[in-house]
UniProtKB/Swiss-Prot annotation:
PANTHER family: DNA POLYMERASE KAPPA (PTHR11076:SF33), DNA REPAIR POLYMERASE UMUC / TRANSFERASE FAMILY MEMBER (PTHR11076). Mg(2+) binds at D10, D113. Poorly processive, error-prone DNA polymerase involved in untargeted mutagenesis. Copies undamaged DNA at stalled replication forks, which arise in vivo from mismatched or misaligned primer ends. These misaligned primers can be extended by PolIV. Exhibits no 3'-5' exonuclease (proofreading) activity. May be involved in translesional synthesis. It comes from Methanosarcina mazei (strain ATCC BAA-159 / DSM 3647 / Goe1 / Go1 / JCM 11833 / OCM 88). This is DNA polymerase IV 1.
Length: 365
C-alpha cells in the first residue's frame, strides 16, 4: 500500500501580506488589518497583522483600540474582503494543480488562506519528492502572486497541519512517519491540533503535560473521562494517527454577513432589525448563484468581545428569506434568554449549500 503524503499550505499573515504587496512602503512598518464597525475611527477588532506588529503584542481578535495603544505608529487598514477573496481564488487554483489526479477528493480548502492537498500518487509516497513539490508550490505562488506561504508535509492531515506552523513565516517542514515521535512528543499537549483550552486543562489536571504523556496513557482511562469517541481520538492523535480523508463538498461553503450594532444593546427590536438586513444580503447572494441552504448560524459578539455561536440544521434545503428570518429569530431569542452582557456585533451565516431544486412551504420547517 502506497505511503500517504498530505501537504498543508498556510499563507503567511495573508490580508496584511496582500496590503504590503500592494504598497511596498508598508513592509518595514507594523500593519494591522481591522474589521471596523464604523462607530468610530478604530472601533472594531483586529483581523490579522504582520510580524512587525506581532512584536508589539498585537494579535488577531483584539480590539483595534487596544492595538493602537500597543503601537500608536502602526498602520491600520480596513478589511478588503472581495479583493482578498480574488487573490485567494487564484492561489487555490495553483494549489489544485499540485493535488493528485484520479478518483476521490485530493484537495480541501479550509479557509481563505489555507488548504490541504494529497500528493501520494504524484510523489509515490516519497517525502523527499514531497519536499520538492512543496518548494515548487512556494516558488509558483511567489512568482505569480508575490506572497509567501508556510507548508507542512506529513502522512496525514493532523501532522501536516501542525508541521506548517513549525517554521513560519515562509517555511517548509517535512515530518515523515519515522519522525512522528520526535516531532510530536516533546510538544505541550495544548499544541495538538484539535485540542482546545478546556480539554487541555482537563488533561493537565490529569498530569498530562506533553503529547508523549498523552500517548502513554491507557486508552480506557481516556475513554472513561472523555467518552469513547473523544478518548479514542486523543490516544490516536497523540500517536500521530489520523485517517481522515480530504473532502471538498459543495455543502462545505458558507455565506454570511456580520455587522456592528449602532450601540451595545440587548434590545430585541434593534438586533432583529440588523439581522433582517444581514439576512437580506445573504439571500441576495444566494439568489445570484441560485443556491439554497440547510444550516443557519447566528453569531453574537458581546461588549467584552466574547463570541457565541448557535446553529440549526433544517430538514431539507430552502432559499426563503422568511425561513432564514424565522430560524435566526428563534436563535436570537435563545441568546437573549441566556445573556446579560450587551451585544456589540451580530452575524448571520448559512451553510449546507446546494443548487436550488424548488421551494417548499414555510410550514414544512
Amino acid at each position: 500500500m502506497m505511503q500517504r503524503v498530505v501537504l498543508h499550505i498556510d499563507m503567511d499573515y495573508f490580508f496584511a501580506a496582500i496590503e504590503e504587496r500592494e504598497n511596498p512602503e508598508l513592509r518595514e512598518k507594523a500593519v494591522v488589518v481591522c474589521m471596523l464597525s464604523g462607530r468610530s475611527e478604530l472601533s472594531g477588532s483586529v483581523s490579522t497583522c504582520n510580524y512587525v506588529a506581532r512584536e508589539f503584542g498585537i494579535r488577531s481578535g483584539m480590539p483595534c483600540s487596544r492595538a493602537k495603544k500597543l503601537n500608536p505608529e502602526a498602520v491600520f487598514l480596513p478589511v478588503r474582503k472581495d479583493f482578498y477573496t480574488s487573490v485567494s481564488d487564484r492561489i487555490m487554483e495553483i494549489l489544485r494543480s499540485y493535488a493528485d489526479p484520479g478518483n476521490g477528493d485530493s484537495f480541501e480548502q479550509i479557509s481563505v488562506d489555507e488548504a490541504f492537498l494529497e500528493s501520494s500518487e504524484r510523489t509515490g509516497g516519497d517525502f523527499r519528492l514531497a519536499f520538492e513539490v512543496g518548494m515548487q508550490i512556494k516558488k509558483e505562488i511567489k512568482e505569480k502572486e508575490n506572497l509567501t506561504c508556510s507548508i507542512g508535509i506529513g502522512p496525514n492531515k493532523l501532522i501536516s497541519k501542525m508541521a506548517s506552523s513549525a517554521k513560519k513565516p515562509d517555511g517548509i517542514t517535512v515530518v515523515s512517519p519515522q519522525d512522528l515521535e520526535a516531532f510530536l512528543w516533546p510538544l505541550n499537549v495544548s499544541k495538538l491540533w484539535g485540542i482546545g483550552s478546556v480539554t487541555a486543562g482537563k488533561l493537565q489536571e490529569m498530569g498530562i503535560v506533553t503529547v508523549k504523556d498523552l500517548a502513554e496513557r491507557d486508552v480506557i482511562e481516556l475513554i472513561s473521562i472523555f467518552g469513547k469517541s473523544r478518548g479514542t481520538w486523543l490516544k490516536q492523535a497523540a500517536s500521530g494517527i489520523d485517517d481522515s480523508p480530504l473532502k471538498e463538498r459543495d455543502g462545505s461553503e458558507q455565506i454570511g454577513r456580520i455587522a456592528t450594532l449602532p450601540e451595545d444593546s440587548l434590545d430585541k427590536k434593534l438586533i432583529s432589525s440588523l439581522i433582517e438586513r444581514l439576512a437580506g444580503d445573504v439571500i441576495e447572494k444566494l439568489d445570484s448563484r441560485e443556491l439554497s441552504f440547510r444550516i443557519v448560524t447566528v453569531t453574537v459578539i458581546n461588549s467584552n468581545f466574547r463570541m457565541y455561536t448557535k446553529s440549526r440544521t433544517l430538514s431539507h434545503p430552502v432559499s426563503s428569506k422568511e425561513v432564514l428570518l424565522q430560524v435566526s429569530g428563534e436563535i436570537l431569542d435563545e441568546f437573549l434568554s441566556e445573556n446579560r452582557t450587551e451585544f456589540r456585533r451580530v452575524g448571520v451565516r448559512v451553510g449546507g449549500l446546494q443548487k436550488k431544486k424548488g421551494q417548499k412551504s414555510l410550514f414544512d420547517y
